[in-house]
Amino acid sequence: MALEKIITAPKYKNFTINFGPQHPAAHGVLRLVLEMNGEVVQRSDPHIGLLHRGTEKLIEYKNYLQALPYFDRLDYVSMMCQEHAYSLAVEKLLNISKDIPLRAQYIRVLFSEITRILNHLLAVTCHAMDVGALTPFLWGFEEREKLMEFYERVSGARMHAAYIRPGGVALDLPLGLCEDIYKFSKQFASRIDEIEEMLTSNRIWKQRLVDVGVVSAEQALDWSFSGVLLRGSGIAWDLRKTQPYEVYDRMKFNIPVGTRGDCYDRYLIRVQEMRESLRIVMQTINEMSKGIIRLDDRKITPPTRDQMKQSMESLIHHFKFYTGGFVVPAGETYTAVEAPKGEFGVYLVSNGTSKPYRCKIRAPGFAHLQGLDFMARNHMLADVVTIIGTQDIVFGEVDR
């Protein structure tokens, strides 16, 4: 008697696909290994390090002033905010935090908020382009061009400014710049309205973002999220309010907070943060008084060009400052600022020489990218692009 063959259903196993690093939605050099069940993501494994340049080690071989430009090149979309964190850390070690001139503090806050608008414009419009809306991207870059002109007029560079330095800022604001920033601020609110008109109530935009990449408040804290990803989950934590630095305690602004913790909430928060940054920009312009823009201590800040050409002592100070740097007392500090992407922190250790003994950089994007696996799980492949866009990842700071 012939045995009946038992028919069993074939076992389908998941397959893996590589997303990036050449993919236009990978936001740089992200390589994702996705485990897929059909069109549904079961697991995502980010492979980082393709933009690793050894920044933290390089800083150990430079003096404190020479190390500053490395911070522009970490998150190369929010440059001055990172210079700001480093400068505050060095000032803490030098014990001069309370001596920074008031005008310099206002200028720092002004350009930190201009940088925040620069970052959020890129984040929102590139996110829209990833999802399929090209027009806001073109509008956003038109406005970013104006902001980069302000960067250029104050520092000579459109991106890597090296403008905020320990002890103050490199140069005073040129004549007419405050008036031009004021004019920009008056018209920029209507540009935000145009972007919102295109996206906020758009049916397709909402279908792609609502209930995608949901992060609960508990998950956000467990994964060390900060910035927009933390506030999108309903936690009103902003270092400018909770741990004010510079003149943020004098500024009136609100912290936008989400309720659902999804991609749509995070989009709305970024748009609202641009409006709040405009409020701060207007306040700094109105309240800024005349005065010196860096500490009057020739061991920490260089003399002006005029002084250098008239006084032999100033020339000697200038030469010694730029060749040997300045000695920082032994100690350590962790200093954080509210960068556009989240909490950007610098852990700086000094051994009493003119070079840092150790500089550990806490990049917000690194923590956010770790959460991609649980955020993308059980979503479609197309939603992964949306989630990466809403995380606002830049690989300069992730890979360092």
Curated annotation (Swiss-Prot):
SUPFAM superfamilies: HydB/Nqo4-like
Gene3D superfamilies: Cytochrome-c3 Hydrogenase, chain B
Record has Nucleotide-binding as a keyword: no
The keyword Oxidoreductase is annotated on this UniProt entry: yes
Source superkingdom: Eukaryota
Catalytic activity of the protein: a ubiquinone + NADH + 5 H(+)(in) = a ubiquinol + NAD(+) + 4 H(+)(out)
Coiled coil: none
Primary localisation category: mitochondrion
Its EC number(s): 7.1.1.2
Gene Ontology MF annotations: NAD binding; NADH dehydrogenase (ubiquinone) activity; quinone binding
Enzyme class, broadest EC rank: translocase
InterPro entries in alphabetical order: NADH_Q_OxRdtase_suD (IPR001135), NADH_UbQ_OxRdtase_49kDa_CS (IPR014029), NDH1_su_D/H (IPR022885), NiFe-Hase_large (IPR029014)
One GO-annotated biological process of the protein: mitochondrial electron transport, NADH to ubiquinone
General function of this protein: Core subunit of the mitochondrial membrane respiratory chain NADH dehydrogenase (Complex I) that is believed to belong to the minimal assembly required for catalysis. Complex I functions in the transfer of electrons from NADH to the respiratory chain. The immediate electron acceptor for the enzyme is believed to be ubiquinone. Component of the iron-sulfur (IP) fragment of the enzyme. Component of the iron-sulfur (IP) fragment of the enzyme.
Family listed: Belongs to the complex I 49 kDa subunit family.
The protein's name in its UniProt record: NADH-ubiquinone oxidoreductase 49 kDa subunit
